[in-house]
Amino acid sequence: MPAKEYRKAKTGLAVVTLFMLFAGEAIRNLLGWEIFMGMGVLITAIYIVVIIRARHLIHWRSIPFWLAFFALFAVASVTWAYSPANTALTLWPFIEVTIGGVGIALTLPWNDFIRALGTTLRWVLAASLLFELWVSVFIGHAIYPVWVDTTAGKVPAVYQWSRNLLFEGGPIQGVVGNRNQLGFLAVIAQIVFSIQLAQKTVWRNWGTVWIGLALLTIGLTRSATDIIALAAVAAVTALVLWMRSVPATKRRPVYLTAYAVVIALTVLVKVASSAILAVFGKGSDLTGRTDIWAAVTALAEQRPVFGWGWLSPWVPWLEPFNNLAVRSGVHYLQAHNVWLDVWMQLGYVGVIALAIAMFALLSRSWFIAIDRPQWDLDDTRPYSAGSLLPLLVTVALLAQSFAESQLVVQSGWALVVILSLTVMVPTRITKALT
């Protein structure tokens, strides 16, 4: 296959893979679990072949140690797990996502990855808004996935694919079937679309429209978590731009100012937490999250060091996980906090490994964002908007991690793997953008 066509094929495969990770619920809800799982196996097999062909690109120094340790520790947990069979069952999709992330990071040039990410997110947002419009205009009532039996009596609203709330101003769930996930994808889209507009890789009017649609989607989801994530991304963007405007030898006052602002905001949140929650329409229990956190903490304390074994998401038929998070008769399958989730599953060892891995990703991404591209004696190369992507996506993931467990499953884990592998070799980003 000619090089140009092969490059297009790799980008196309990445788009399909990312769509499955970002909006897999749409495929499951429309076609069923069997087809979705079959597609996952096929894509994994393709990426295994791709990785084998590109094995010469793998160097030990380019492997993020703590991320690899966390992944291997999760796999090894099957040996001491409370339920080895169920741990093995949930490890398979984790391994699939890891393989896909490694394949994308290893074989897709940085600019092609940004392009693939932008294309995927446009498809997800467009499909979500059109889907909600179709439900409101032509259906006129909430609809359920094909695998939900609506003849067996009243089905909880949480299982609805769309709640038919578009004309009421939301919250909408889009094709992903979850407003928090849709809102988070819109936050990532906002980052990618803004970078593409700044890089002039899309038409100005076209890019502006998509930025507007991403903001509209965030608003229609009414997700407090994602609004906070967007605010964190905006604050870090402002800080990076400030850093770039100051010579490297004079950045200490900027750091001190940033630390002071973080401390002030922490105190403000602590003192005015009730008022802040009221603004977002939340009660003191954070929509039931505090009860879930208490239950997960109590279970984690029984096996604090190595945990109960990997179970993400929790399996709904296994005691005691099936009754850990119950709200209005609905059994939720995550802790709504990735750090508590990992503590329960992999103990202190897993939490420490993940924390170090994320800190390494954050710190490497930070310096890639604030420093000029340099791989020789030339230190005058211009800054690029594209070098902001790893940092801003990482900030968004971390902001979400305290209210959701998405960081270690599906789209969240894929992004962590891709970005962690990429920032280990900064020139993959900097040389691609100059």
Model-derived features with residue positions:
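Transmembrane signal-anchor hairpin modules in multi-pass inner-membrane enzymes, especially those
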Residues: 1-76, 112, 426-434
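Transmembrane alpha-helical segments and their membrane-water interfaces
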Residues: 82-138
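Membrane-interfacial entry segments at the cytosolic side of transmembrane helices
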Residues: 111-121, 202-208, 245-260
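Alpha-helical transmembrane segments of multi-pass inner-membrane proteins
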Residues: 118-241
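A membrane-periplasm/extracellular boundary helix in multi-pass inner-membrane enzymes
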Residues: 130, 134-139, 237-284, 298-302, ...
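Long extracytoplasmic/lumenal interhelical loops at the membrane interface
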Residues: 275-294, 298, 306-346, 365-373
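Hydrophobic transmembrane alpha-helices and their immediate junctions
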Residues: 346-395, 432-433
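Transmembrane alpha-helices of multi-pass inner-membrane enzymes
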Residues: 390-434
